[in-house]
């Protein structure tokens, strides 16, 4: 049984635009899967359908054999708790401390009133500190989030996802706003988390060379259709040309080794 299964998934927006067109796809536990494609190809729609930030129109998505599509109430909350999310714009509470932002990864485990009052148990605080240590910013735990650099803020969001103790982490263009050196540091963090903790990483990336360097598997979308799915070794220039419908351009290469 695959960890994530897309079964004939279709997403049609209210304006009639087809975001996903009959996607059939299996993602295995421990994959570092990179989704690539031009802007508007369906990358974010595919990623965000996994935890139902976007609901699909037809088909079904299964997580560990359970239907995410049909889940509701407590079952949906429990399934989402197992899926961490990292955003391009970090999605932090800027005026809150680093520690408080990371602890927000624990909200799915406790009653809302306790979280509003900041009543996190000692065990959660230990998990938060361990998550910060794993991404090398433990020394910033008392700082306000808006005092930190973009790269540090993205590391906070990774630590927040880790604090959930997820089996899957979704990352939607997490390095799009970062400089090349910081990009590599963040990608190294994600790769290490994948390898050391066995957490499945599914990530949207714009840069071809990053996809090849860090991914174990490449998933290519064009106009909402799955046009490539295979190990990174098969992701040749010709394969990317097929995914993009044109040659790779210089701005699609980060150029950092």
UniProtKB/Swiss-Prot annotation:
What kind of membrane protein is this, topologically?
Peripheral membrane protein
Localization: Cell membrane
Task: Enumerate the spans annotated as ABC transporter domain.
Answer: 4-248
Cited SMART domains = AAA (SM00382)
Q: Which reaction does it catalyse?
A: phosphonate(out) + ATP + H2O = phosphonate(in) + ADP + phosphate + H(+)
The record's function comment reads: Part of the ABC transporter complex PhnCDE involved in phosphonates import. Responsible for energy coupling to the transport system.
Q: What is this protein called?
A: Phosphonates import ATP-binding protein PhnC
